């Protein structure tokens, strides 16, 4: 993806997100999501338009789900997201292929990134802070959920491909754990 496409994607995500969910929630989502995606890799669309549409849908769905969920249940989202990310990430795919050494390096760093994100969420969840920074907490929680969902989409797409194509498809070294 070229710089112009990235700029367009992030501009649209931040504008739409800010309009629908608030600027602070959207920025905290974007920062956390980029940090998580850097290490987990997840699903990558084949075309720019497909990527843009999936990004907009994923951001919107995760923000709506988190906004509707009482904060007392955020811990379950964190645990679910952590489990999925730790179990599946990083993944390899045709759109962004990583070497084995790159995969190993990312796998080693993922727990540290998750620790930092979880610690930030726990601090934001504390009673005196939560009242003033609830938007940021929702954005971080939505980003964790979104990253976990991209990994699940990747795995489900691989399983679907194996069911449809059976063993006749070419072997790949894509990890689905």
Task: Walk through the language-model features, giving the residues of each.
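Short, small-residue-biased leader/transition segments that mark boundaries at the very start
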Residues: 1-3
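Structural signature of hydrophobic alpha-helical transmembrane segments
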Residues: 17-29, 75-81
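Membrane-helix boundary/juxtamembrane motif in polytopic membrane proteins
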Residues: 93-117
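C-terminal ends of transmembrane helices
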Residues: 33-44, 90-98, 155
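Interfacial aromatic-anchored transmembrane helix boundaries in multi-pass membrane proteins
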Residues: 37-65
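Short, highly charged, low-complexity non-transmembrane loops/tails of multi-pass membrane proteins
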Residues: 160-177
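Hydrophobic alpha-helical transmembrane segments in multi-pass integral membrane proteins
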Residues: 62-72, 115-131
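Cytoplasmic-side transmembrane-helix entry/capping segments in multi-pass membrane proteins
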Residues: 46-57, 75-79, 103-108
């Amino acid at each position: 993806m070229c710089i112009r496409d990235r700029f367009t994607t992030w501009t649209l995500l931040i504008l739409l997100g800010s309009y629908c969910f608030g600027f602070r929630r959207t920025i905290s989502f974007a920062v956390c999501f980029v940090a998580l995606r850097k290490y987990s890799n997840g699903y990558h669309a084949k075309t720019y338009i497909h990527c843009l549409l999936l990004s907009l849908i994923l951001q919107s769905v995760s923000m709506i789900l988190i906004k509707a969920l009482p904060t007392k249940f955020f811990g379950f989202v964190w645990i679910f997201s952590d489990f999925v990310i730790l179990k599946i990430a990083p993944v390899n795919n045709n759109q962004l292929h990583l070497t084995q050494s790159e995969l190993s390096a990312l796998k080693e760093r993922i727990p540290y990134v998750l620790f930092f994100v979880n610690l930030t969420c726990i601090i934001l969840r504390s009673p005196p802070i939560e009242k003033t920074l609830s938007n940021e907490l929702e954005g971080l929680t939505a980003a964790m959920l979104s990253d976990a969902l991209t990994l699940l989409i990747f795995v489900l797409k691989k399983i679907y491909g194996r069911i449809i194509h059976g063993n006749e498809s070419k072997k790949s070294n894509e990890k689905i754990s």
